[in-house]
Amino acid sequence: MEIDIFEDKENKVFNRREIKFYVEYEGEATPKITDIKSKLVALLNSKKESTVVDNVQPHYGEPKALGYAKVYETVEDLEYIETKSVIAKNTEASEEAEEDEE
């Protein structure tokens, strides 16, 4: 899986960076959002807790997808602005299991 970032815009109103990217995945299924998020965190040198992948739209008939991610300044900004559904789909199964145990 390769990620090619083609737009990185600063949004000062929401204290975040807005990232648009292409994901290329030759010979495999469309990657999970959590896998894409992990790779983006490494590429952008951001914190995993303050990064969300908003959506990934596969191209029909091609091993390629268009994605949109947001990197917030703080976790508090992310929790205040993002919907629970976006936060939930960016949470890994192991993190959810830990929260259920508490």
UniProtKB/Swiss-Prot annotation:
GO terms for biological process: translation. Keywords: Ribonucleoprotein, Ribosomal protein. The keyword Ribosomal protein applies. It holds the Pfam family Ribosomal_S24e. One of its GO terms (molecular function) is structural constituent of ribosome. One of its GO terms (cellular component) is ribonucleoprotein complex. Belongs to the eukaryotic ribosomal protein eS24 family. This is Small ribosomal subunit protein eS24. It comes from Methanobrevibacter smithii (strain ATCC 35061 / DSM 861 / OCM 144 / PS).
